[in-house]
Amino acid sequence: MDLSVKHILLVTFACVMAMCLASACSLKDDAAVEICAKNFGQNYFNLRLCQASILCTERSHKWMAFYASNISQEDVNVVNAQADSALCDISDIDIDSDSARVKMTVQNFLMCDSIGRHGRMCKKGKCELILRKEVETWKVDLNGPITITEE
């Protein structure tokens, strides 16, 4: 075999291996982002806010505290009286290096859209979460209250 043909084959093989490794890392990140976002959503929308806050960045804790301060005992009773808990499904994940944008569909959740008023149960809604990678761990990064669009 000609030396240049060997060189081309070696470079091609190296490129293919690099793409395989990159896609494996990407698949690993996709799975980790999906698991984090779904676990956060399941806890957040079922008012298990302590468990949800563990999955957040440090700067998100003030927004978790803000949300918790606006949940009344009546809201908790309404959620607990539901036959089915809130369910979250991930519809899209867009990863860019150490950040990710996740689109989530939520079913059977408490909609708290006005301060000072009790929440109400909603059948279905959509929201978007931002996640950040901190020391190899994906965490939800809240920059304000979660905005949910009711469907």
For the regions a protein language model found, what residue spans apply to each?
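Short solvent-exposed beta->alpha transition segments
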Residues: L49-S97, R101, Q107-L110
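Exposed beta-sheet edge and beta->alpha loop/turn motif
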Residues: I95-E151
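Short, low-complexity N-terminal intrinsically disordered segments enriched in polar/charged residues
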Residues: S4, L21-N46, I54
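Sec-dependent bacterial lipoprotein signal peptides
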Residues: M1-S23
